[in-house]
Amino acid sequence: MEENGLFSLGYGNFEEQLNLFSMNKVGGFKTELAMRDGFFYIVNGEAEKILSLNSYGDLLSLFYNEDFYGSGKKSLPSQSSVGKWKKIAYPFALGGAIAADARKYIYTACAIPKERNEQNASGDLLYSQVVLRISSDGSTIDYIGQQGPAGTPFPYISKLYTTENNELVVICKMNDGLCAYWFAENGFLRYKVPVSIKNVPLIASDQGVSDIFVTVENIVPDNYALRLYVKADYYLPSVDAESNVQSGIHYTKSLVYPLNVADGAFGEPLTVPPYEESVTENFSRMQYRLPYNFLGITKNGWLCFIVTTESGFSIEMISDVTRNVVKRHLDIKHQDVLYYTLAFSNDGIISALLADKNEARVVWWRADLLIASLIK
């Protein structure tokens, strides 16, 4: 699939630059990307700001942490661009998942101050994040918790999604799976749907093995219906032939289950063929099977999956209606990329922010055009 370069951003602390390599920050990168209707939203946690840009890279708005930029360490913008800057008055640390809806509302996961963290009743799950919500013109900035506006903090937020009905879906990591919080357009909770490895359907083993291990890799909402798509990866134990002792586990299958949000019932699963690669070494050939990661679902019902390869990314798209499978490859020179983050739009466009040693490039691949040609 052909890559389309859109624009690039330099490194630094000016308004149209990204700070990815801050020396006073520890841990992983805190910069994420979202794209909706041709507009890009980049949360740059290292610089405590959110950029809103068009597809040419023109800065439309910049939302900044008031505490961070008011500390004297960072300067405010020049008078010529001051109208684009909007304050975030909450003491949150930016740098999590980000999404936008059709109204151009921005949602991003934030960490709250440690003294405001909470725990569940059993004390084994930390509630430490909220979702910052910003209206299209920046006039309204508030936050969403488990119950809605100003609610209890979430567990760790792995993904944020918005539907075509402008409803926010928050995916959180739990001790035994994932949990989906489905919010109405006004931000109040409609459904809370925990998906544990204990209630995901098991599969029968053709090897007569009773111990089957399952992980819930991701949950993606339908764009219109009250339906979640739950991707489960299944593993079987590996047994040493000589000692007859379990030596590990190996991947066997991936299934995506439609889950009715209203009654919690699982539907008939869709099989996700694994990524397969052959490696020849010392006159022997090894066949590797890897599970794809669930990237998202389009408005017309195509599920998109992705896995990293040596030469880029392998993409697999499956129609929820016809079950047709389409595979493509995205060419990326990983040796030149220091950091990347991907986004998938409801239209079927795959976007990426690719950071090398000189700049961060924003590109996309028009998978939506491929899907349109298949539907005709």
Spans of model-derived segments:
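Eukaryotic scaffold repeat domains enriched in small/polar residues
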Residues: 1-376
